[in-house]
């Protein structure tokens, strides 16, 4: 695998591409971590630290991206302090939504690195290509079958992790012909409860999952047709930070894509896709000591399509047009079984539907003096409705006048300028405006228990769209052996959606301290910085370092929840012939700006060290690769600020992997 790291100076911090024996630096408009068939790339070993790493591990090392951790599995992406409905997460351009009211199943858990070709990240309001957003976007691009290659290629590997007695099996294969190709991959993971830095077992941290993907690609003259199928199923997934675990989490994805590459003077390429995905999630408390057993299933089904075209309209203008539509249906239920009475039923997400149609246009303009400007805009029309019946009747208790159907328009407009100055510097500036829709949970949620602040949450169908005004400034320096980039950003969010205590309402969950209701507050603000460094002083030595941090508060000066501390990761790598070694230093500053209103506590800083090594060799059958390492070398007891419930991170972990390629 080769990982190419492109960082938008305005929105992230650097872009680096390693060629066969030299570093080439470009500055583009997004972060991309891209997989191709090689093991010789510096950044692969930074982002995907070992072959047992999952998608969440890779995301956590990207600048501007963080994770809310409730377990060893099912971690929720955060972009510059924004998460949930504030950001867009797509799988190969497909809209997809989790089915858990407790956010145990962000859609990123349903894909594995072996499924992926690339991860694209755009930060802030500039990430609106695939949907209106205020916080940014992540698009996980699926790997494609490769045509015109050796007829059959593939790999198989096994990994082991001592901290959780975890096993990871993976395999993929590509069958190639001149006009067609087929790809299949399979992954199996199983981990027991892990131990923290004090040697104590973190109960309910186990998980098991399987992942299968199939893809076909056919060349028809200048056209390409692709078909994708992916199914991912997790079982017996523990969540130590929550009062319930997950019995089953299953997602299925289907897609058919048409691509046309032309020699036309004006139309460069056209891509159209139709897709569907289904998510089922079943919470489980059968292994917990509870006062009352509950069944809590959830469903989320999405169907959609898009068309995307790039047009060379004028000599110095490249236009992108995209139109898309999706329809989502979500439902979550709860059945309670009191020990001394009849069962009780409620809908924690009342059955609701959302249809969104949008259009996006961008103009990339080349101006004299190597100045490059990108202007983009998006308009979405959304129709959200709640189904007549039980779920709607629940909300009538609180909102007797609310409308069954909510219609809203969301808008975004962004401008970015990039200017090389002197010989080795690049300046970038971005200003933008964006809006986002309230989520179905924020609109219709019914007594959703939040373990972090011990409150029940109720939605508000009268919410307005949340807005954001954003600006970024970046500066970069590069030469043959050094790349240094820094970015500062600021966002002002009017009508920020936040939940506040309603003292007029009584909690339903036993032990809950009260009820919170979502509302629009006047505003909130976010600011922070990101920094990256890549040094290659010698052919065999590379140093990579990333630093990122965000601060956020309301207009009243109250800290916002889920804001990470400043974090750094530094990696020093040595390669010689068939051997490599890598030393990493990871750490974070203390977070003393915690949101006590949302159950947060100040978090101390930490530093940990990781040591990795690898060796590869060839024989007539193919290539063998061996790797081993020690993570958290000093067995440090620590946690990060976004780790719910004070649950500690794993202690010292010895891992090893063996892989064969043919």
Model-derived segments and spans:
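Flexible loop and strand-edge segments within Gram-negative outer membrane beta-barrel domains
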Residues: 191-193, 203-209, 221-270, 275-302, ...
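Short, acidic, small-residue-rich periplasmic hinge/interaction motif at the N-terminus
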Residues: 20-49, 54-56, 84
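Structural signature of Gram-negative outer-membrane beta-barrels, strongest in the C-terminal barrel
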Residues: 316, 324, 350-493, 536-539, ...
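Short acidic/polar hinge/loop motifs at secondary-structure boundaries
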Residues: 95-124
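Outer membrane beta-barrel strand-and-loop segments of large Gram-negative receptors
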Residues: 215, 298-309, 348, 352-358, ...
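C-terminal beta-signal and adjacent terminal beta-strands/loops
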Residues: 492-495, 499, 543, 589-594, ...
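Gram-negative outer-membrane beta-barrel transporters
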Residues: 367-369, 373, 381-382, 489-493, ...
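N-terminal periplasmic accessory domains that precede
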Residues: 51-59, 75-78, 90, 106-111, ...
